[in-house]
Amino acid sequence: LPASSGAAEAPASVPMATLAPTNALKARANDDAALRRAILSTERDVVVEMAGGSEGLVRAVPMASLGAGSQAFMAQYGVQYPLYTGAMAKGIASADMVIAAGLKGMLASLGAGGLPLHRVTAALDKIQAALGVDKMPFAVNLIHAPADEGLESGGVELFLKRQVRIVEASAFMKLTPWIVRYRVCGLERGAGGKTIAKNKVIFKVSRTELAELAMRPPPADIVAKLLKQG
C-alpha cells in the first residue's frame, strides 16, 4: 500500500510511521529482511512504504527466500520448498511428475504401488538420469503386501541397490523386516558418535497408534535377526 492510502498527503517532516495503523508492521519495498518478517506475520496488517510515499509496484520476494512453511521439512529432505507430492499408485505419480517437482526444489514420490519391478526400475532409470544418483531428493512408494512378500522384499532390495534415499511406506500395520532393513542399511556413525540415517521413511498412517509405532526404534528382535543374516 502507498503510505498515503486513506489519508491526506503528509508533509515531508511527518514520520512515515504516523500514517500506518498503530499495530501494523512496516516494511520498505527495498528491504528484503523486513518484507520477510512482515509477510510471515499474518495476524497483523502490513504497510509497505514506497519511495517518497508514491504508488507503484512492490517487488515480490521469492517464496524460497521467505522461508515460508516448515524449515525442518526442508532441512530434513534437502528441498527448497516445504511442498510434497504424495505417491499415486500404478504410476499415476509418474517419473515425469517426480522429475518436474524435483527440478523445482520440491519433494515428489513415485507411485510404484501396483507396478511390476521392471517398470519401477525403468522409472528409476529415468528419474536418476534427470535428478542424479543420491543428489536431488525424491521418494518412491513401498506398499506392504502381506499376500506377496516378494513385492515388498524386491522393492527394498531395488531401492538399496539404486541408492533411493526416501521411501514412502503405505498400508503398513506393523514394522516388517523389509522396511526395517531399508532403514538400518543407511545408518552410519558421524562426527562425535552421532548416528546418521541416510535412508528416510515417510509413513502414511491412518491411526495415531500406527504413527507412534513408526516413531519408535525398530524392534530389537528384527534388528538382531537382520544382523545375523548379514
Stretches with model-predicted labels:
Residues 6-230:
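Active-site entrance/lid segments in N-terminal catalytic domains of soluble metabolic enzymes
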